[in-house]
Amino acid sequence: MERSSRADLISEDSHPARTHTCGDLRAEDNGEAVVLKGWVDTRRDHGGLVFVDLRDRYGLTQVVFSPQDNQTAYEVAGQLRREDVISVQGTVRPRGEEAVNPDLPTGAIEVSADDLAVLNTSETPPFVVSAHEERQMNTNEDLRLAHRYLDLRRPDLQENIELRHRLYQTTHRYFDAHDFLEVETPVLMKSTPEGARDFLVPSRLHPGRFYALPQSPQTYKQLLMVGGLDRYVQIVKCFRDEDLRADRQPEFTQIDVEMTFATEEQVYELTEGLMADLWDTLEDTTLETPFPRMTYDEALRTYGTDKPDLRFDLELHDVSDCFAGSGFRVFDSIVDDGGHIVALRVPGEGDRGRAAMDRLEDHVTDEIGAAGLIYFQLPSDGSGIEQNLSSDALPHEYGRAAAEQVGAEAGDLVLTLAGHSPTVFEQAGALRLHMGEELGLRPPADEGDDAFLWVTDFPLMEYDEEAGRPVSMHHPFTAPHPDDLDRLDEDPTQVQARAYDLVLNGNEIGGGSIRIHNHETQMQVFDVLGIDEEEAQDRFGFLLDALRYGAPPHGGIALGLDRLVMLLAGADSLRDVIAFPKTQSGKEPMVKSPDWVDPEQLETLALRLDLPPDVEPPARIAQRKRLAS
């Protein structure tokens, strides 16, 4: 075995304690005696010398072993491999002028080794771990996650974890300075599913009953306000059993905030202050506050989404009136049925060739899911207008009217989709993002100015066709606008909520609302949602009871900490900013969770598996089950 053949290299660490990290030393440290400890990043044999790049969390230092300084250390250094753990005693000296590395903070110096101790050896890692980006291979993510302890040695991942730590500390200091109390809420709570599924925890002491891991501390933080604690904050783990994607994890962290007697303006001001503090501390950037605001309806109709990316200017336009009386049956039937024709002006793309337009049409139908794309090209030579419909089907004058309404000029392209709200606006919004990325208008996550936006005035409820009833747009504790209370029973989807989302570069990073603090209003909302009095008392009786005892007005916000770090780091995925994340299938390859448990454990919990026919437990579990029976 590799380990046994190299075991004789390992020695006791007889060196003094580490004097410096591998990122500390500079030219002014010339001549200083130092002790460094870390991992071998690379080893090079050159001109009778051994060069080792020694790495730790703080940086990289070049160490030079010479037979003239210490023959034994030189010979051992020649046997070092990547990821061996060593301790080096030596002296700082300047590098030769031709050897200076200006890209490395320690690149002006090297350490001439006087002694070497190998603290542990490493087998050949399954992938390259290196501070040198060019040596980092495109490794399969599942392999990296299966050996996350190695992956965590990569400097870019360590920088993300450090950034996360600094965000934690800045957040704690900010809320402490604003007189907030940090209160821990229970992790084992009652199951009150709303939207996503709960993760359930069976109770051994109460067979047949279950705790749930919190999807958020929503009800608890409201109860803290009823309890008079006035200002609450918690950086808290939350859990949702839902389908995953790049920006979702089954367990995630949020900055949870609640205040009594709060108005929307106070929540905005507090949150903007936190963002300004974070950007100043972590990015050395001054944010302009207050952030711009946009209603939900305006965001949907202008950008096709409730989380618009304002870093580029393409906007949607409702051009339904331009096609009135056109005789084009597709447009006429949709508009007559209350639908919309939505246009997107794309500057400078009026000369696109037929093949490029065919690919765009395919993308609209295959990827975006729209019924079709009607487009109008205004060639840059000013020759008129071209469209992908015959003039018999749709006379050119209607396309020209739409182009004029959206401000198109010679050389521009006008794209139109037809359908019903909100779907057609969402499809047009997806087309906007596609064009922004294809044309390089949308900056990468780690480039360009950040664009914050408050989206306000959400509907309190939306109609769920599958459920056949209204459902909460946010959650059932969101306060309706007082002017709309009389519409709650008759037309709940037209009731405006006192809710708001914070958006950054097209990502929702937080959401909150002013809460219902009146028992009667809360019961009325439950009733509209199809939750009768008995079910409401069973699921939320503790909160309903609390609202009877002088509950103060209150409101707050929850900010996604993982997503904030991801955007600050310019990372592609939440998995790049969490130490031990789950995969997109909800698994953790390193510890192999979720895993089967012994039948005895299930029996203790009064549980029995009823598996689908195509799922069988592994042999080790099946064998134990037979023995137990």
Swiss-Prot record:
The keyword Cell membrane does not apply. Residues 1-24 are annotated as: Disordered. Keywords: Aminoacyl-tRNA synthetase, ATP-binding, Cytoplasm, Ligase, Nucleotide-binding, Protein biosynthesis. It catalyses: tRNA(Asx) + L-aspartate + ATP = L-aspartyl-tRNA(Asx) + AMP + diphosphate. It is an enzyme of class 6 (ligase). GO terms for molecular function: aspartate-tRNA ligase activity; aspartate-tRNA(Asn) ligase activity; ATP binding; nucleic acid binding. Residues 218-221 are annotated as: Aspartate. Its EC number is 6.1.1.23. HAMAP family: Asp_tRNA_synth_type1. Aspartyl-tRNA synthetase with relaxed tRNA specificity since it is able to aspartylate not only its cognate tRNA(Asp) but also tRNA(Asn). Reaction proceeds in two steps: L-aspartate is first activated by ATP to form Asp-AMP and then transferred to the acceptor end of tRNA(Asp/Asn). PANTHER family: ASPARTATE--TRNA LIGASE, MITOCHONDRIAL (PTHR22594:SF5), ASPARTYL/LYSYL-TRNA SYNTHETASE (PTHR22594). Homodimer. This is Aspartate--tRNA(Asp/Asn) ligase. The lineage of its organism: Bacteria, Pseudomonadati, Rhodothermota, Rhodothermia, Rhodothermales. The gene is aspS.
